[in-house]
Amino acid sequence: MKTLSILVMAGGTGGHVFPALAVAEELRARGALVEWLGTAKGIENTLVPKANIPLNLISVEGVRGRGLTGLLKAPFLITKAVFQAISIIRKMNADLVLGFGGFASGPGGVAARLLGKPLVIHEQNAVAGTTNRLLARIAQRVLAAFDGAFHNTSTRVVKVVGNPVRPSIYQLPPVAERYQARAQEHPHLLVLGGSLGAKAINELLPMALAQLNEGQRPEVWHQTGKAHGESTAALYLQQQVNARVEPFIEDMAAAYAWADLVICRAGALTVSELMAAGVASALIPLPTAIDDHQTRNAHILASANAGVALVQQTLTAADLAALLSTTLADRPALMAMAQRAQHLAHPNAAATVANVCVEVAHG
């Protein structure tokens, strides 16, 4: 059987790139030749070379929010990017193009269509982004992490496959074993400000925890993001709250295994990791996220009683303190929430996406 050549398109943020990397590794494990299409400004420039995957760059940026000048320039920039993508697809003689959203996926998907190459797309969020909504009309197969992502979009049948996440998170001990082993300890609170940091979360948590009696306070492990480590540590000190504060947590599997409750944003990858790990959560969606997709992501967990969704615009330190006081005191409820989250997981997401790619490529 001919060795498959597959171009993976993903870029901009970790939410696009990490799931794509998981599928790329699965495809390579099956013997496929994989190359990557991205842009010069995205996180893929660091992550993809580390994975020893050839990285091809095209010149394209987002159009939304760029103003009139950006809209006028867009057709010329997109046309240029499409021709760059055509050249890359021809050079590697791709059998299939696989898109995960982000700026590079649009021109790459159009190039695939113009060259008659099969296109498969995957949407990570609970509401499809602009690029994937457009590409869904020309793709051979449309995959989504969550049901309803392409609601009100004229598209083919959507297959719900989940989000690929790192295997180490699926290899944690069972939920009941983890939660029961800590039954006599103070609860463990993991706070994730995200790799870039969520200022609202970083500022709110120290103030909320300060309102709890010392005997009620959990053990705290707080990831602040690179720019907010010192300022957040200073806030905890000012509020006289003990916390382990780190700009970045390298081993997220260990962090999830440690946690009884996670407070975090509701990015697609984070929500999928909470499901995979089986851990209770209180989600504070980013209010400025495009199409308010984080609120929709949070709703996936909240609607199944597998997490709590909060609203940043109205959330106060007193509100959060009350939630923590009630939630952390009820370990059986935390464990049940964690188990419900894990029931929503898709442990074989990367393999499922790879299966679809192989099936479509072989026609």
Swiss-Prot record:
Cell wall formation. Catalyzes the transfer of a GlcNAc subunit on undecaprenyl-pyrophosphoryl-MurNAc-pentapeptide (lipid intermediate I) to form undecaprenyl-pyrophosphoryl-MurNAc-(pentapeptide)GlcNAc (lipid intermediate II). It is a peripheral membrane protein. Gene3D superfamilies: Glycogen Phosphorylase B. UDP-N-acetyl-alpha-D-glucosamine binds at T13, G14, G15, N125, R166, S195, I249, A268, L269, T270, V271, S272, E273, Q294. InterPro entries: GlcNAc_MurG, Glyco_trans_28_C, GlycoTrans_28_N. Pfam families: Glyco_tran_28_C, Glyco_transf_28. Pathway: Cell wall biogenesis; peptidoglycan biosynthesis. This is UDP-N-acetylglucosamine--N-acetylmuramyl-(pentapeptide) pyrophosphoryl-undecaprenol N-acetylglucosamine transferase. It comes from Cellvibrio japonicus (strain Ueda107) (Pseudomonas fluorescens subsp. cellulosa). The lineage of its organism: Bacteria, Pseudomonadati, Pseudomonadota, Gammaproteobacteria, Cellvibrionales. GO terms for cellular component: plasma membrane. It is found in: Cell inner membrane. Belongs to the glycosyltransferase 28 family. MurG subfamily. PANTHER family: GLYCOSYLTRANSFERASE (PTHR21015:SF22), UDP-N-ACETYLGLUCOSAMINE--N-ACETYLMURAMYL-(PENTAPEPTIDE) PYROPHOSPHORYL-UNDECAPRENOL N-ACETYLGLUCOSAMINE TRANSFERASE 1 (PTHR21015). Its EC number is 2.4.1.227. GO terms for biological process: carbohydrate metabolic process; cell division; cell wall organization; lipid glycosylation; peptidoglycan biosynthetic process; regulation of cell shape. One of its GO terms (molecular function) is UDP-N-acetyl-D-glucosamine:N-acetylmuramoyl-L-alanyl-D-glutamyl-meso-2,6-diaminopimelyl-D-alanyl-D-alanine-diphosphoundecaprenol 4-beta-N-acetylglucosaminlytransferase activity. It catalyses: di-trans,octa-cis-undecaprenyl diphospho-N-acetyl-alpha-D-muramoyl-L-alanyl-D-glutamyl-meso-2,6-diaminopimeloyl-D-alanyl-D-alanine + UDP-N-acetyl-alpha-D-glucosamine = di-trans,octa-cis-undecaprenyl diphospho-[N-acetyl-alpha-D-glucosaminyl-(1->4)]-N-acetyl-alpha-D-muramoyl-L-alanyl-D-glutamyl-meso-2,6-diaminopimeloyl-D-alanyl-D-alanine + UDP + H(+). The gene is murG. CDD domains: GT28_MurG. It comes from the Bacteria. Keywords: Cell cycle, Cell division, Cell inner membrane, Cell membrane, Cell shape, Cell wall biogenesis/degradation, Glycosyltransferase, Membrane, Peptidoglycan synthesis, Transferase. Its main location: membrane.
